[in-house]
Amino acid sequence: VRYFGKEHAEEVMQLYRDYYYAYWEQKSADFPGLERQFIFHDLRYARVFKQIGEGFECFSSNPLKDIIRERVPGRSFRIEGNNQVDSLLSGMERTFDRFDKVAQRCAQLMPQLPEQYRCFFLDNLSAPCHYMAALSHSLYHFLRAYKYTEKRTKNLDLSIEYLEKAQEALYSTQHGVF
């Protein structure tokens, strides 16, 4: 109510919930009752891009390695399944669809919000949601380029296009004093 007005508080609350639930849960929780213990957040995206990018020409179904100082084997990514690439492709496909839907709802709500609430809504929810949608699409196409060499150029072009959209979402939050 405080940040978005009484009229839109419930809808915004649901958008926040759906945004956080859009993240891919790549591994089931280790602790009972600890819902969504493992989510695939943006730092993991960066590590996937980096690690696969470094060995892009030599396909491996399990290309991701633990970060150097990791004390627990397998903890860096915690991806369930025998094939990291297929698990990531499946996870990103579900994830970008969920982020796309929440981003679309954010875009529909934005003009309905009173002017004084729009900047905070953009910076705190709408832009991050658009960013994660685009980043998820980008990683999906990057992984497809890595796995399917016959359509590598097309998928890399799409990956770059979505990275540029992700960058635009970040830039949309660069404005005057909040």
Task: State the predicted function of each range.
Residues 1-178:
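Substrate-binding groove of N-acetylhexosamine-processing glycoside hydrolases
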